[in-house]
C-alpha cells in the first residue's frame, strides 16, 4: 500500500514562508508612504511660511552677491562732509552764545563790532588800514601791559574755537594776485596756529554807488573790482577747505552796491542796523557740527 504523505504540516510551513515577503512589502509601502507624506507636508509648511526653506549653496552665493551689489543708503545731510569753495548754505539758527569762543579778525569794518557793541560776547582783533600782509607783521595791537604785538600774535594768545576773518577793503588798489598770495599766507599761518578752530572767511563788503562815483574815491575802488577780489577769496576758501560766509547777501542791494542809506558818511563803513543784519546772517549760516 502506497505511503500517504501527510500534507497538513507541510502546507502550514509553506504558508509561514509565503507570509514573510508579503510582510516586507507591506512595511516598504508604509515607509514610502510616510516619506511621501513628509515631503508633501514639508512643502506645505514652507509655502505657508511655518518653516524656512533651506537654501542651496548656489542660493546663498546669490544672496551674498545681492548684498554686495546693493548700494548703501546715502548719509543724512547732517552727516555729509561739508562742501568747500562755495558759500555756506543756510543752517539752523544758533543763539548768540555760539560766539562766546569766537574771534573776529579784520580791518576797520570789523572794528564796528566793538564800536556798536553788536556782539559783546565775541572778541574782536582788528585795526584800521590793515591788510593780509600787515596783519602778520605790523605791531598794532596793544596788550594789557602796554606792549604792542601783531594781530596774528594776538589771535594766537586768544586761542579761539571759531575765527571770523574779514580783510581786504584796504587792498583793492593792489594787484589782485599779490593780494591773494598775501591772503593765502595769512590763512596758512592762522590754520597752523589753530588747527582745531572753525575758520570762516567773509567777503570784502561793497561800497555805495555814491562813493564809487565820488571824487573822494582816490583809489578808484569799484564794486566790480571788489567782486573780482571776492571770487579769489572764495577760491582760496575752497583750496584751504575753510568756510566762506557770504554776508554780502544781506549787505548789498540788487546792483551789488552797499545801499546809500547804509553808509551816508563815507560810503564804506555802515551803521548799527547793518551790523545787526550781518550778525543775524551769521547766526543762520554756521558750519555743520
Labelled PLM ranges:
Residues 183-187, 230:
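Generic structural signal for well-ordered alpha-helices
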Residues 22-37:
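Hydrophobic membrane-insertion alpha-helices, especially the h-region
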Residues 38-101:
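N-terminal, intrinsically disordered, polar/charged segments of Gram-positive cell-envelope systems
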Residues 194-198:
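A short helix->loop->beta-strand "cap" motif at the edges of active sites that frequently abuts
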Residues 92-181:
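Conserved SGNH/GDSL esterase-like catalytic core that processes O-acyl groups on lipids
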Residues 1-19:
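N-terminal Lys/Arg-rich, disordered targeting/topogenic segments
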Residues 207-289:
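Catalytic His-Asp segment of secreted/periplasmic serine-dependent ester chemistry enzymes
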Amino acid at each position: 500500500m502506497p505511503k500517504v504523505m501527510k500534507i497538513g504540516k507541510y502546507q502550514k510551513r509553506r504558508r509561514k514562508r509565503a507570509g514573510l515577503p508579503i510582510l516586507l512589502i507591506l512595511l516598504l509601502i508604509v515607509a514610502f508612504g510616510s516619506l511621501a507624506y513628509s515631503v508633501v507636508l514639508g512643502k506645505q509648511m514652507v509655502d505657508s511660511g511655518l518653516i524656512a526653506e533651506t537654501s542651496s549653496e548656489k542660493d546663498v552665493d546669490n544672496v551674498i552677491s545681492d548684498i554686495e551689489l546693493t548700494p548703501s543708503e546715502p548719509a543724512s545731510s547732517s552727516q555729509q562732509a561739508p562742501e568747500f569753495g562755495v558759500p555756506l548754505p543756510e543752517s539752523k539758527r544758533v543763539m548768540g552764545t555760539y560766539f562766546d569762543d569766537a574771534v573776529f579778525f579784520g580791518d576797520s569794518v570789523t572794528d564796528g563790532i566793538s564800536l556798536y557793541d553788536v556782539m559783546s560776547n565775541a572778541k574782536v582783533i582788528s585795526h584800521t588800514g590793515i591788510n593780509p600782509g600787515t596783519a602778520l607783521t605790523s605791531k598794532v595791537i596793544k596788550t594789557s601791559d602796554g606792549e604792542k604785538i601783531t594781530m596774528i600774535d594776538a589771535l594766537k594768545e586768544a586761542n579761539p574755537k571759531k575765527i571770523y576773518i574779514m580783510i581786504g577793503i584796504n587792498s583793492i588798489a593792489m594787484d589782485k594776485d599779490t593780494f591773494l598770495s598775501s591772503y593765502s599766507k595769512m590763512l596758512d599761518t592762522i590754520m597752523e596756529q589753530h588747527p582745531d578752530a572753525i575758520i570762516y572767511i567773509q567777503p570784502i563788503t561793497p561800497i555805495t554807488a555814491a562813493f564809487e562815483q565820488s571824487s573822494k574815491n582816490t583809489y578808484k575802488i569799484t564794486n566790480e573790482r571788489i567782486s573780482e577780489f571776492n571770487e579769489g577769496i572764495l577760491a582760496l576758501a575752497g583750496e584751504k577747505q575753510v568756510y566762506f560766509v557770504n554776508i554780502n547777501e544781506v549787505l548789498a542791494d540788487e546792483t551789488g552796491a552797499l545801499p546809500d542809506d547804509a553808509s551816508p558818511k563815507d560810503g564804506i563803513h555802515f551803521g548799527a542796523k547793518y551790523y545787526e543784519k550781518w550778525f543775524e546772517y551769521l547766526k543762520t549760516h554756521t558750519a555743520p557740527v
